[in-house]
Amino acid sequence: MDIVSVALQRYSTKAFDPSKKLTAEEADKIKTLLQYSPSSTNSQPWHFIVASTEEGKARVAKSAAGNYTFNERKMLDASHVVVFCAKTAMDDAWLERVVDQEDADGRFATPEAKAANDKGRRFFADMHRVSLKDDHQWMAKQVYLNVGNFLLGVAAMGLDAVPIEGFDAEVLDAEFGLKEKGYTSLVVVPVGHHSVEDFNAGLPKSRLPLETTLTEV
């Protein structure tokens, strides 16, 4: 199936079949999707929590209490639930970790090439954390790049998913001690197979016309 067909067929799943689980191979593949998403300057300012056990999913679903109970069953019934987290600070230690990993992976022919790459990344990091002081927004944008990549990727695998912002981030952050680890939760994405009760599965997709959202020059 080509990528456009995948985009046309995927949708936000409203109900999951709790009896249908991802295979071990599928579970490994979704982790690979998370790992290899693009990000600005390859900064990768993220962390993921993947819940597949009943206990793990219940911990994530605590964040759906109160005003967000309508999302609780999605988190409990899906085979896997992914919590997308962003770093709360783009620190020098992280930048060093990224460039050292790139070096270990063989991306630099010379030490000078490594230094130039590191300098370029730090230019943009400093632009956001020092000049613009919007590094939190910048890092969140990278996480959302990952979410979009992930949604299309799991759809290409024949899996169903839904991006959820309707949850209590403070509850979720506290449950997993994210603040202490330098992260905050942004999006929760349950993944699995839709239920026969999923009303959204049979509805036509709706998007604004290109004449409204696209300009060609």
Curated annotation (Swiss-Prot):
Reduction of a variety of nitroaromatic compounds using NADH (and to lesser extent NADPH) as source of reducing equivalents; two electrons are transferred. Capable of reducing nitrofurazone. The keyword NAD applies. GO terms for biological process: 2,4,6-trinitrotoluene catabolic process. CDD domains: NfsB-like. Its EC number is 1.-.-.-. The gene is nfsB. Belongs to the nitroreductase family. Keywords: Flavoprotein, FMN, NAD, NADP, Oxidoreductase. PANTHER family: NADPH NITROREDUCTASE, OXYGEN-INSENSITIVE NAD(P)H NITROREDUCTASE. NAD(+) binds at residues 14, 41, 71, 74, 107. The keyword rRNA processing does not apply. It is an enzyme of class 1 (oxidoreductase). It holds the Pfam family Nitroreductase. FMN binds at residues 10-14, 71, 165-166, 205-207. This is Oxygen-insensitive NAD(P)H nitroreductase. Its cofactor is FMN. GO terms for cellular component: cytosol. Gene3D superfamilies: NADH Oxidase. Homodimer. It comes from the Bacteria. GO terms for molecular function: oxidoreductase activity.
